[in-house]
Amino acid sequence: MPYNHREIEPKWQARWEQDNAFVTTEDPEKEGFYALDMFPYPSGAGLHVGHPEGYTATDILARMKRMQGYNVLHPMGWDAFGLPAEQYALDTGNDPREFTAQNIETFKRQLKDLGFSYDWDREINTTDPKYYKWTQWIFTKLYEQGLAFVDEVAVNWCPALGTVLANEEVIDGLSERGNHPVVRVPMRQWVLKITEYADRLLEDLDELDWPESVKEMQRNWIGKSEGAEIDFTIDGHKKQVTVFTTRPDTVFGATYLVLAPEHPFVTDITTEDHEEAVKAYIASVQTKSDLERTDLAKEKTGVFTGAFAVNPISGERLPIWIADYVLATYGTGAIMAVPAHDERDHEFAKQFDLPIIEVVKGGNVDEVAYTGEGEHVNSQMLDGLSKQEAIETIIAELETNQVGRKKITFRLRDWLFSRQRYWGEPIPVVHMEDGTMKTLDKSELPLELPMIPEIKPSGTGESPLALAEDWLDYTDPVTGLKGRRETNTMPQWGGSCWYYLRFIDPHNEEAIADPEKLKYWLPVDIYIGGAEHAVLHLLYARFWHKVLYDIGVVPTKEPFQKLYNQGMILGENNEKMSKSRGNVINPDEIVKSHGADTLRLYEMFMGPLDASVSWSENGLDGARRFLDRVWRLFERTADIQDVTTVDADFERVYHQTVKKVTEDFTNIQFNTGISQLMVFVNEANKQPVLPRHFLRGFIQLLTPVAPHLGEELWEQLGFEDTLTYAAWPTFDETKLVSDTMEFVIQVNGKVRSKLVISMEATKEEIEALAFADEKTQEWIGDKTVRKVIVVPKKLINIVAN
């Protein structure tokens, strides 16, 4: 009877559900293992074949660890707030809750069809008020710690859509949806002070077992720079402009200053004759995103303000320009330009014919900026000094004259945390009539998102919540003071910053989770997901975790001990899968045609888990053929026997298989572990008798990858219990190597025969066996043996003529 996945897979899925097979055990005597997937956004499109790749990896580990005697926490949930559901609501007039619930149902069905061993009792959904009560509670704690504040921030405002857009939603000054013009305008926003944690976020990376590339991306994003601040007075004004530079030693090479167009001094210092040009330039910049403005490849633009600054060290007058490549949100929003030794400044100086003064020897600065090291020149007291000596000398000079100071800065910006959207967590803040602000008490949470008959932009820059008039009104239960609720909502990042904590104790109504449970399960042992979350999600989650650590909620400094990024599955033509290319593969179709176990096996066998690999129908068919061979092997019921003596070669292959699969699966090298399972099947097919205990061990090794087939074969072998908790097989070190080996016999340097000889055979015994071999005798014939060379454990060469 051929292997029928359409019968076998639903049978075992129903059995697992009925038995609640994967409920998390919490035996205090056992060690815990927390295997976490990056939970998905439940989109309308459902799962694609990229999702199961990471999910199968964590499932293999979870299933293996259960058999190895661990308590395993392997949960799944939904990161369900976000733009697509809101856009759907705007486009159709339907409630995003319905859309989200339908999508979750589809995703959940698909995940169950793939046989993942999730503990569905712990399912969470970021849009559930019982969940976001705690997201809001964490926000109140951030506020109490002074880490959440309101600020005027320049945002991407799209008048046509009546809403604020994230940088990713703006392309070439137009909205991604509808191609409407977008302008930069200042707006009141909630900001989280992640910069307070910059040093710790940087230092603690060293303690994590993460891909080096991800750690490096986070280091660059945090961007720690050591240098100095220098104060330049403005000619004819009482104001001074402070700039930050990592090269204060080049201060004598500064030939102009550049302010960001949004710098608060621009209006005051611009002279009358330059006013019109400055205003026009500022207007032109408003349609550009920060990314476009800082693009190194683009042509430099800028305009002179008519004002001059005074170099505090040399006394030189320097023209003050504004240019879009300087951002108000970075550093001090102003730079001292040293065109001889900075590429962007050099391009700008060439563009606008500004002076270029060499202060570090080593290049031809008229042609190109010299950014290397060298002796200082044209720099008064710094002449002849090296870079480090010059930096120390000039900082001392700046501090003595009180015109500058040593300074460490970070590229990391504070985190803009509010969105002018409906479909997000309401921010638990009230603006009171007396002008104060208060966060809601824990007893007033969750602050639920109100049902609105029609979700549409308010048009004022506020979220659609500004239209929910009854909901907006608030009366303080203690003082009776009236207030108006905050209308901004949280970004999608809010709910995903801490979800791994809620999985630990998802039904707790008094706290995020029981402190003892947090202590038991944290940090997460393995976190698998795509590299696209390398910076934002992982940095934000680390930040929140550290705040929770500081206030005594969590017991560890870091949330995720080991992180692993799976690669991307590309289309057959090596292109990224996308709807527009028409090369997206739906896992439902594969489950129907080949089976879930085939899909799981194929995706793990495609190549190393972290590599990007092209989809191949041939490869998929090959995976199915292997499972068919396994099925046929177990159809040899008469050959499956309880035996006391076994074939030595087969025994060796079995023990090698247990060892290699255990090690490879533990090290997330699933493709090579699966190769070894194939070696075992090849060897088994040569055997007239199949020892039952070898086949039993093989099923257990195969099951984490192909659980439905594994359970079916386990039942066929006569076991009544599920193998979810069957003890993982062990190997015997002494059985890994053979006590005999194949020895090559050469006559006059050519291979003429082979013999199986004991590993312990002496040189004399090997010679005797070789000369007794019939084939060897034929080749020697009546020749005279001149010499015999024995290479231990390899070959014997007989020289005869």
Swiss-Prot record:
Its main location: cytoplasm. This is Leucine--tRNA ligase. One of its GO terms (cellular component) is cytosol. One of its GO terms (biological process) is leucyl-tRNA aminoacylation. Belongs to the class-I aminoacyl-tRNA synthetase family. A motif ('HIGH' region) lies at residues 40-51. CDD domains: Anticodon_Ia_Leu_BEm, LeuRS_core. It is found in: Cytoplasm. A motif ('KMSKS' region) lies at residues 576-580. GO terms for molecular function: aminoacyl-tRNA deacylase activity; ATP binding; leucine-tRNA ligase activity. Keywords: Aminoacyl-tRNA synthetase, ATP-binding, Cytoplasm, Ligase, Nucleotide-binding, Protein biosynthesis. It catalyses: tRNA(Leu) + L-leucine + ATP = L-leucyl-tRNA(Leu) + AMP + diphosphate. ATP binds at residue 579.
